């Protein structure tokens, strides 16, 4: 019996070290950043068994066998469709403003499409008003409505959107709704799920979460896009989830969530529709590519002074493209750079780019919320304050709610708006979308909104920050170690 137990013991030890060796090998060949690699190596070596479990759950970017197979081929198929779109030469902006040229060229080479002009762009800054405008558009829809959200929380004005979709489906409009399984768990447990399905709305639970799936793929890869498409002509995107701002997470004590959305009329809806089609096919296996734009309608509203690039990031899409785009945008700044983000856990490259911009004379401002819904992110963000302040970056902490907007403004000309947070999960894992807008008039509107944010913020003082308590510095160092894992 003793021999048997000894055999089992040594077998467990052998398996354990084989797993350690295998994970070590995988970490080294992945060419991760050095801080990320070191964090993972320390985790698996210092925390026996638990470290291995953490790696299998969160260390590998793995969607699942079927979804991974579809995701690999889907973008190349979409590029074939993009080639058809290229026949509409008059909707593409070949020449951009000086500050936007490098970024648009990057997107052209990585995604195969020029910036799209001939769009009417509106910036929506109030969630209540945004949803009211959306409901009017839903009732005006004639052919199709597609939506994807990370969070749909029933209650309040969100129920008005549900009713508008139900009414539209009943009058023959083809309605599709894709919601993240984790973010919209309350929706899938509510009566609205069955009510909307019975009315004829196609609903997909994206990246399903369950105990079984823990062993099949990573659960922290989320569908984080926010997209609305109506009749292949009207499109919405930005940071807003489908929630009532007066009801959503009010118990957390952070106040109302502050968001930005863009409403666009024009051919960019087709480019966004291709992204939606890719996501739909990954989940269902069915293609729903949008119709090509109506040429006659587009010719009537041609706008030569602005253009939009759509950047899709996530598994199956061009690798690291959003990270490259952010770096290119920051290095393009010559006079002013204003960044708004709820979560500030940048990569080393982004941190270096931001600090370098300030050190070469660019006026750099970062606006973040004073109050957070995540303790982990709050402390992880604080780690970077000292280096940013030393470089001359101004850090503003928004006081009037949880600032959830994600935007970048460069030299009052180039704007980036979308779903991407400046954290590792948005940069490397999630399905995200970013609109790059080369339009001075739109940028002035965004600048006015960012000024409102700053007016309702407190400026973090460099000297005061340097005198913070010693115990907070220790906590910051701990979270600095964890930041590559967030």
UniProtKB/Swiss-Prot annotation:
Keywords: Cell inner membrane, Cell membrane, Lipid biosynthesis, Lipid metabolism, Membrane, Phospholipid biosynthesis, Phospholipid metabolism, Repeat, Transferase, Transmembrane, Transmembrane helix
EC identifiers of the protein: 2.7.8.-
Topology with respect to the bilayer: Multi-pass membrane protein
Record-linked Pfam families: PLDc_2
Keyword Isomerase: no
Domain PLD phosphodiesterase, first and last residues per copy: 219-246, 399-426
Enzyme class (EC, first level): transferase
A GO term from the CC aspect: plasma membrane
Reaction equations catalysed: 2 a 1,2-diacyl-sn-glycero-3-phospho-(1'-sn-glycerol) = a cardiolipin + glycerol
GO molecular function: cardiolipin synthase activity
Subcellular location: Cell inner membrane
GO biological process terms, semicolon-separated: cardiolipin biosynthetic process
Annotated transmembrane regions: 3-23, 38-58
Active-site residues, as the UniProt record annotates them: 224, 226, 231, 404, 406, 411
Annotated function: Catalyzes the reversible phosphatidyl group transfer from one phosphatidylglycerol molecule to another to form cardiolipin (CL) (diphosphatidylglycerol) and glycerol.
Family: Belongs to the phospholipase D family. Cardiolipin synthase subfamily. ClsA sub-subfamily.
PANTHER family membership: CARDIOLIPIN SYNTHASE, PHOSPHOLIPASE D
Designated name of the protein: Cardiolipin synthase A
Gene name of the encoded protein: clsA
